[in-house]
Curated annotation (Swiss-Prot):
Pfam families reported for this sequence: DnaJ, DnaJ_C, DnaJ_CXXCXGXG
A GO MF term: ATP binding
Official protein name in the record: Chaperone protein DnaJ 2
Gene3D superfamilies per record: 6.20.20.10, DnaJ domain, Urease metallochaperone UreE, N-terminal domain
CXXCXGXG motif repeat ranges per the UniProt record: 145-152, 162-169, 188-195, 202-209
Subunit: Homodimer. Interacts with RNase J.
Function: Participates actively in the response to hyperosmotic and heat shock by preventing the aggregation of stress-denatured proteins and by disaggregating proteins, also in an autonomous, DnaK-independent fashion. Unfolded proteins bind initially to DnaJ; upon interaction with the DnaJ-bound protein, DnaK hydrolyzes its bound ATP, resulting in the formation of a stable complex. GrpE releases ADP from DnaK; ATP binding to DnaK triggers the release of the substrate protein, thus completing the reaction cycle.
Record gene name: dnaJ2
Note from the entry: Was identified as a high-confidence drug target.
Cofactor note: Binds 2 Zn(2+) ions per monomer.
Species this protein is from: Mycobacterium tuberculosis (strain ATCC 25618 / H37Rv)
Binding positions for Zn(2+) 1 per the UniProt entry: 145, 148, 202, 205
Database matches in HAMAP family: DnaJ
Length: 382
């Protein structure tokens, strides 16, 4: 049976907090062990101290007013489940400790909170990724309210504690069940969990301390960035509720495909089509490199189809150093498909002079260093 805490202090259930405090002090002066050494007085002093502790706590007093005893609920097997042993822990694991008298208060979430990060996607061509670029972009984020400077109030008014939750940011409900008393908490619907309300809010931000606005900012993209990389701009994201500190803005790079070059990390690849005669005799071709302008590339005599000529340090710059990747030039030998009579005679003459060179069928993995040769060595050791 619940103890009569009001009766212990000699006050009614409608007593104010001041009445309860006054009654406790009066009894404490009479029953304090330093004044009254009698054992019965000491026991009585402990009882009124417990009663004052319960009734001065709004949550515990609410349980008393509903016919419960917060101390019995807390002591009876943990969170008001009595002889059910660990069953209270099971419900606490599933329902966040919202049972019995032991439901912990989360407290207000705070009116001023940090803002969230923002993401902006930016398309860049290969040249811009190679050289770096500074661009003006338009972002749409929450910014500090310029009328109230983030306070959310109108003029000199200030936030005040919420009457509904008493500044705790949450409201609690006690219900009886077969398992005992159940205490549940939920965010206060009046203050939305922050614990305070603004009686005279700013008419521009309506008390939020921030407004949405479009603004232009300068974004500096460093040389060497690649597709999917992000550049962080500190404190350029969303301003937080109540004028809280802004989050960060992340600019995500989307690299557009190039007409000539294919990027592989810091390396660049391109293909040069060389006529059959030039591949046999050798030739110099000109490539418009990304960072080096027009560059001459020497195709040596006897270059075979699929050959790769590597130009060291002529690729993309490394993002965090002064080094550069390589430029790989893939040679494609073009065999003529249309020949006139003179072309045919010249080729036949060449064939006659090189009659020892005949077509032959070879195993694909016969050539040293070929793909099949390397696979065979890997699996057979030969």
């Amino acid at each position: 049976m619940a103890r009569d805490y009001y009766g212990l202090l000699g006050v009614s259930k409608n007593a104010s907090d001041a009445d309860i405090k006054r009654a406790y002090r009066k009894l404490a002066r009479e029953l304090h062990p330093d004044v009254n050494p009698d054992e019965a007085a000491q026991a009585k002093f402990k009882e009124i101290s417990v009663a004052y502790e319960v009734l001065s706590d709004p949550d515990k007093r609410r349980i008393v007013d509903l016919g419960g005893d917060p101390l019995e609920s807390a002591a009876a097997g943990g969170n008001g489940f009595g002889g059910f042993g660990g069953l209270g822990d099971v419900f606490e694991a599933f329902f966040g400790g919202g049972f019995g008298g032991g439901a912990a208060s989360r407290g207000p979430i705070g009116r001023v909170r940090p803002g969230s990060d923002s993401l902006l996607r930016m398309r860049l061509d290969l040249e811009e990724c190679a050289t770096g670029v500074t661009k003006q972009v338009t972002v749409d984020t929450a910014v500090l309210c310029d009328r109230c400077q983030g306070k959310g109030t109108n003029g000199d008014s200030v936030p005040i504690p919420c009457d509904t939750c008493g500044g705790r940011g949450e409201v609690q409900t006690v219900q009886r069940s077969l398992l005992g008393q159940m205490l549940t908490s939920r965010p206060c619907p009046t203050c939305r969990g922050v614990g305070v309300v603004i009686p005279d809010p700013c008419q521009q931000c309506m008390g939020d301390g921030r407004i949405r606005a479009r603004r232009e900012i300068s974004v500096k993209i460093p040389a060497g960035v690649g597709d999917g990389m992000r550049v962080r701009l500190a404190a350029q994201g969303e301003v937080g509720p109540g004028g809280g500190p802004a989050g960060d803005l992340y600019v995500e790079v989307h690299e557009q495909a190039h007409d000539v070059f294919v990027r592989e990390g810091d390396h660049l690849h391109c293909t040069v089509s060389v006529p059959m005669v030039d591949a046999a005799l050798g030739v110099t071709v000109t490539v418009d490199a990304i960072l080096d302008g027009l560059s001459e590339i020497t195709i040596p005599p006897g270059t075979q189809p699929g050959s790769v000529i590597t130009l060291r340090g002529r690729g993309m710059p490394h993002l965090r150093s002064n080094t550069r990747g390589d430029l790989h030039v893939h040679v494609e030998v073009v065999v003529p498909t249309r020949l006139d009579h003179q072309d045919i005679e010249l080729l036949r003459e060449l064939k006659g002079r090189r009659d020892r060179e005949v077509a032959e069928v070879r195993s694909t993995h016969a050539a040293a260093g070929g793909l099949f040769s390397r696979l065979r060595e890997t699996f057979t050791g030969r």
